[in-house]
Curated annotation (Swiss-Prot):
Binds 1 zinc ion per subunit. Belongs to the peptidase M35 family. InterPro entries: Fungal_M35_metalloproteases, MetalloPept_cat_dom_sf, Peptidase_M35. This is Probable neutral protease 2 homolog MCYG_04257. The active site is at residue 312. It catalyses: Preferential cleavage of bonds with hydrophobic residues in P1'. Also 3-Asn-|-Gln-4 and 8-Gly-|-Ser-9 bonds in insulin B chain. One of its GO terms (molecular function) is metalloendopeptidase activity.
Length: 360
């Protein structure tokens, strides 16, 4: 029940009453140990527990070098608002630099400043923990062949609010631009045919979301495959979320998000298709969104512009509340998620919509 309470806490855009999850001692191929390393600095030590080498993908994990959600931060029983980015990474053509290689029993350390992705200006005592999944490849390989879960220890830190406030936020505020009221797209951020590409993606996202909502009501076998449940509560939530994405994708000035064709905040790191700032209800496309994926993909579970936009909309609290997280990437990992996590996972919605469109 504590884990369920934790999952209910995921993704809330403002602090709220929450139960801090206890950490079960499940066996994992890796061990993650957190330790305080300064006022708001945390050091994560990742150890390979096994007897064979592992190649660990950094994307959306405790090892991600970008300002992604690496840990959960609580204060007075409430989750502290996350101000960083939630990216969708391209999962094909992975290169070795996206991975961390760990030999048997070897460790690697990764440090990060919580104040760069959380508002800790109030200061005081906070509790920090990490939980997630790491896609794995064979030693020296770049093809994902499995995954391992991790659950860290919990640490308590006493934060000096003034020092935390002096830390520059990793993702600042975007400058206002010319907005197309029809789609809430900042047209001044678009170059060449990018506006046309994005408008097509928005239309396709609306169409796929509407079809997915219908399928959630009429195809219990497919709903079970992706969301691991077919009860009325699950159906209602899935349908509601897809319809919310459909409305946002076809918004006539009533949408709750702002969409940028291009990045002005430095979030388009290698491999990032698009990203969301949930604290600002803001979506940004990256160059490879236009160059490396098609408008629609007719391959089962293939990435495309439409489902990437759909994926990012589920990260926005103005569209989906509580907003979806990145708890598992790709079909194999999504298929392994329990119902409580599947319904809070952004890629579950993108893959389900693709499956209905393609007929997987």
């Amino acid at each position: 029940m504590q884990l369920i309470a934790f999952l209910a806490a995921l993704g809330v855009p403002v602090a709220f009453a929450a139960t801090i999850p206890s950490v079960p001692l499940n066996h994992s191929m890796i061990d993650v140990k957190l330790s305080a390393a300064g006022n708001s600095m945390v050091k994560a030590t990742i150890t390979n527990n096994g007897d064979r080498a592992l190649n660990l993908l950094r994307f959306n994990t405790i090892m991600d070098e970008h300002p992604t959600r690496k840990v959960m931060v609580y204060q007075n029983g409430a989750e502290v608002q996350f101000t960083g980015m939630l990216p969708r990474y391209m999962m094909s053509n992975l290169t070795p630099d996206y991975f961390v290689s760990l030999g048997p029993k070897a460790s690697v350390e990764h440090s990060f400043d919580l104040a760069a992705t959380h508002d800790l200006s109030r200061g005081g005592k906070i509790t920090v923990m990490a939980q997630g999944t790491v896609p794995t490849a064979e030693e020296h390989g770049t093809t994902i062949t499995g995954h391992t879960v991790y659950e860290s220890n919990k640490i308590t830190m006493e934060v000096d609010g003034n020092k935390a406030a002096a830390v520059v936020q990793a993702m600042g505020k975007v400058k206002a631009g010319s907005i197309d009221k029809r789609s809430k797209v900042v047209t001044s951020s678009c170059h060449g045919n990018q506006l046309q590409v994005l408008q097509t993606a928005l239309a396709n996202s609306a169409r796929l979301s509407q079809a997915a909502a219908k399928a959630a009501q009429s195809n219990p076998r497919k709903l079970q495959e992706y969301f691991k449940a077919t009860d009325s509560g699950t159906v209602q939530k899935v349908v509601s979320r897809f319809m919310s994405v459909a409305r946002e994708s076809s918004s006539n000035s009533a949408g709750g998000t702002t969409y940028y064709c291009n990045d002005s905040m430095g979030g388009c790191h290698p491999g990032v298709l698009a990203y969301t700032l949930p604290s600002q209800n803001l979506v940004v496309n990256c160059p490879i969104y236009y160059s490396d994926i098609p408008a629609l993909n007719k391959r089962c579970h293939g990435q495309d512009q439409a489902t990437t936009t759909l994926h990012e909309f589920t990260h926005n609290p103005a569209v989906v509340s509580p907003f979806a997280q990145d708890l598992g990437y790709g079909y194999d990992r999504v298929a392994a998620l329990p119902a409580s996590k599947a319904i809070q996972n952004a890629d579950t919605y993108a893959l389900f919509a693709n499956a209905i469109y393609v007929g997987c």
